[in-house]
Regions:
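Pre-Walker A (Motif I) flank of P-loop NTPase domains
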Residues: 2-5
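Hydrophobic anchor at the beta1->P-loop junction of P-loop NTPases
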Residues: 8
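P-loop (Walker A) phosphate-binding loop of NTP-binding proteins
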Residues: 11
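Conserved lysine of the Walker
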Residues: 16
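Conserved substrate/cofactor phosphate-moiety recognition/catalytic segment
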Residues: 21, 25-63
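A basic- and aromatic-enriched beta-loop-alpha substructure that forms the phosphate/nucleotide-
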Residues: 64-101
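A glycine- and Lys/Arg-enriched "phosphate-lid" helix/loop adjacent to the NTP-binding pocket
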Residues: 90-150
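NTP-dependent small-molecule kinase module
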Residues: 147-203
Length: 203
């Protein structure tokens, strides 16, 4: 499988940013990072305010779309590229936070914008149980189990591109050279579809 554009995914705490940076360095590829930090609708002043979840979700969706279009216009995807997010995953958070009326509007906008987004050649989904994610994030958010389950459900049914599911419970998230070499071998052996990979314990 020729992988010029690889997207790394997983819930926060799965280690996607670190892996994306390591892969980009090893492959001499451009690194694309999610730019949705600084969302003005996620501050404490907006928590619980009617419509704030919808505003926050649209901010993320439009920001990711703008970044993707800028990259495509710059012909970045003709070169080796590693991203720490998949545009399609925006829907995971939308279905977690929006009500039915908001989802109806969101879905129509998403359908329009997604047509202009370049699909990766391969998605790598970093998977781990809730208790592992919670320990890594030092997070007591009661919604975390629902979010992790939403990611698992989304990628269980994901068919848009080849998908490599990596079980990360027992690995060193700094991705030392040996672990990265093993992962790259798995990527090179991909022939499309969906495959599961449990790395050797490197923690």
């Amino acid at each position: 499988l020729e992988c010029r554009y690889i997207a790394i995914e997983g819930p926060a705490g799965a280690g996607k940013g670190t892996l994306a940076a390591r892969l980009a360095s090893r492959l001499d590829a451009a690194l694309v990072l999610d730019e949705t930090d600084g969302n003005p609708f996620l501050g404490e002043d907006h928590v619980g305010r009617p419509g704030s979840a919808f505003q926050a979700q649209l901010f993320c969706l439009l920001g990711r779309h703008r970044q993707q279009i800028t990259l495509r216009q710059g012909d970045l995807f003709s070169h080796a590229t590693v991203s720490d997010y998949l545009f399609d995953k925006d829907k995971i958070y939308a279905f977690q936070t929006l009500d039915d009326n908001e989802l109806f509007i969101y879905q129509r906008l998403y359908d329009l914008l997604s047509r202009e987004v370049t699909q990766p050649d391969l998605v790598v989904f970093l998977q781990a149980p809730v208790e592992v994610i919670r320990r890594r994030r030092k997070d007591r958010d009661r919604r975390l189990p629902e979010l992790v389950e939403a990611f698992n459900h989304f990628f269980f049914h994901y068919t848009a591109t080849p998908l490599l599911v990596v079980e990360t419970s027992q690995i060193d998230l700094t991705w030392p050279d040996a672990a990265l070499d093993d992962l790259l071998r798995q990527i090179q052996q991909m022939h499309g579809g969906k495959q599961y990979y449990v790395p050797r314990n490197s923690a």
